[in-house]
Amino acid sequence: MNPNLTKHRKNIAVLALLIAIVMVSLSGRLAYLMIFRSGHYSAMAEDLHQRERTIKAARGRIIDANGVVIADNRTVCTISVIYNQVTDREHVIQVLCSELGLDEELVRKRVEKRSSREIIKTNVDKELGDKIRAYRLDGVKVDEDYKRYYPYDSLASKVLGFTGGDNQGIIGLEVKYEKYLKGMNGKILTMSDAKGVEIENAAEDRIEPIAGNDLHISLDVNIQKYAEQLAYQVLEKKNAKKVSIIVMNPQNGELMAMVNVPEFNLNDPFTLNQNLRSQSLQEMAAQTADLPASKKQEQLNQMWRNTCINDTYEPGSTFKIITAAAGLESGVVKLPDQFSCPGFRVVEDRKIRCHKVGGHGSETFLQGAMNSCNPVFIDVGQRLGVDGYYKYFTQFGLKGKTGIDLPGEAATIMHKKENMGLVELATVSFGQSFQITPVQLITTAASIVNGGNRVTPHFGVEAVSADQSSVHGFKYPSKGRILSEETSATMRYVLEQVVSEGSGKKAKLEGYKIGGKTATSEKLPRSLKKYISSFIGFAPADNPQVMALITIDEPEGIYYGGTIAAPVIGDLFKNILPYLGIQATEEETAVHVSNP
């Protein structure tokens, strides 16, 4: 037998065996994939031919106390291209450049980019989006989205806040109530062929979006408008740095208005305000393009800042409301108690002056309050002592925050009890050497005159689903009694006398009983001679339904609170009291004060 033939047959046999083994292995693998992994690969194949697109949910609206929409949504479009679906790139580039006003190089780069989806432009007006859709360009998608829109532009800008590019809240109520306002996006799954082109009339899975809840708030657009108008008048007349006004219902803490002028345009929040009073900021606003990014962001943060809650200041004589209430509640002073004011008071080694250089002479405590006499309130503070004063400072809720439903509330800056000597006690008694926020002052004053119940300042009333099927009411229970009804009634009487016969006369309003207190506080450092003029008022004095606080930062010329701040609140009340249904009356205040 031929040995070569035998060897050749063996080689053929080995090769046949190897082929058989490979075939069996491939058959086994194929059987495994077809039987056991078919579901997996079917899903992969389906995924390759499915395209998921988001259906944006509408953000909930913000609605004022009268049902007026003050934060809404506008339909806008996002223009994008899908590379595999574009059939005429030059035509697509030409149309998009022309209609969107974009640079050709930019559009070409995006149209020719090999990606599943490339965004050309966002926030395109719906009218223009519809026009582009009408071209029926292969591979060009026009998807509808929502953009936040504020019908009143700058009204209550630092209260409402605004949203970012992702339609999420950034500042103000927009961020505080984000979980209620934001909706839940839906999605749509469409089928496409091997080239990625959508198959028309193919079955699709669709999950509908759920719109966010509407937020109903206590802010009243009409009161806010008028308060802003008055604030801007003062800002311009006194060339002030800024002006703030807070309007509150002292019975429950509902905020009807909160003004911080200059405000900014909510529909264009990243452009520096050209109305900034500070010369340095004006120059920066005019040179926005030249500002480093970090510097511009710093200026934007300053522009967005809500003075009423984010900033602290020395309240000055408006804080005498707290000292008087503590003194009366503790019993260390009564209205007819006699005091003497020679124009100063010496405490330890310090000579602390009254605003009236020649002094007020002999006066009762009531007269001292009407005259806003520093020595009288220094004496009341000394009678209380450090322990007593600290007790009421804490009891009245001044050491903590108010709990207002806005982000970034600043805390009170106060001496530590162990570091508070008689001099510090003296200056605190008439509103100096410590700092609080305007919202803390008005909240505490409201709690003193409303019968003695500590309230929580707030805007949020309820969140209502788009289909009205769900209503979530926000609760703000009283934080407890801080002083007796008797002391509260006495304080209402005292503060009415301040307006009717004392330093707050310019807030007097014919036919109405108004209570209030003036203040002129000197800013730090004292050497600069810069002032904050303020006035806090409420009406009717015997049954407070509305309270307002104005602060005027660095007014030029005459700067006394009783002269420039009190008249503003008088004008405000003249317009909003009838609007709120509070009728004028010539009756005298019916207040019973024990041991007058």
Q: Residue locations for each model-derived region?
A:
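Periplasmic/cell-envelope proteins involved in peptidoglycan metabolism and beta-lactam response
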Residues: M1-A286, M303, T312, K334, ...
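Beta-lactam-recognizing serine transpeptidase/beta-lactamase-like catalytic domain environment
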Residues: A71, D193-E204, L219, P250-T318, ...
